[in-house]
Amino acid sequence: MATIVDQAKAQMAKSVESTKENFSGIRTGRANPALLNGITVDYYGAPTPLKAVATIGVPEPRTLAVTPFDASQANAVEKALRDSDLGASPRRDGNVIRLTMPELTEERRKEYVKIAKGKAEDGKVAVRNIRRKAKESLDKAIKDGDMGEDEGDRLLKELDKVTKQTTDELDALLETKQKEIMEV
């Protein structure tokens, strides 16, 4: 029956990873290739993720360099970057498209912090749902006689401990992200 807690722990770890991934798409003062994850390019008529049609590098702290694999698609890549809501205008430099990230205003930083808080809360909701399902499984096992009350109580305490550790980890991630965003 400890497998119920182990499964919950694994699912909570996935939730933390998902939250980290979501955080990587939120802009900070620095250029980060993950900012371009949601951008799709009209590649020969088919919407294709940018990272599938170009390499993305960070030559300078506030600059992203996007190099299409196929030079003939540079215009399509540039158009996709221009149409995105990054707030940066692409500059062509031969086959390389450079995106210089503008400094974030205080208002925009606060907006990004708000988005980060929302994503962290989504992660916490997922963790609470995982805990609830695991608790229901433990309660059912006790009711069906598959485990004793004492064993169930011990596993529930372990589940609560794992849940608290995970929510604390999400809080720490949020705090770190907030500092990154507010850093001038």
Curated annotation (Swiss-Prot):
Q: Keywords assigned by UniProt?
A: Cytoplasm, Protein biosynthesis
Q: GO cellular-component terms in the record?
A: cytoplasm
Instruction: Tell me the compartments it is located in.
Output: Cytoplasm
Q: Which domain of life is it from?
A: Bacteria
Keyword Cytoplasm belongs to the record: yes
Which GO terms of the molecular function aspect are on file?
Answer: ribosomal large subunit binding
One biological process GO term for this chain?
Answer: translational termination
Tell me the protein family, please.
Belongs to the RRF family.
Q: Which PANTHER family match?
A: MITOCHONDRIAL RIBOSOME RECYCLING FACTOR PSEUDO 1 (PTHR20982:SF3), RIBOSOME RECYCLING FACTOR (PTHR20982)
Instruction: Give the protein's function.
Output: Responsible for the release of ribosomes from messenger RNA at the termination of protein biosynthesis. May increase the efficiency of translation by recycling ribosomes from one round of translation to another.
Protein name (Swiss-Prot/TrEMBL):
Ribosome-recycling factor
Say which species the protein is native to: Bifidobacterium adolescentis (strain ATCC 15703 / DSM 20083 / NCTC 11814 / E194a)
What is the organism lineage in this UniProt record? Bacteria, Bacillati, Actinomycetota, Actinomycetes, Bifidobacteriales
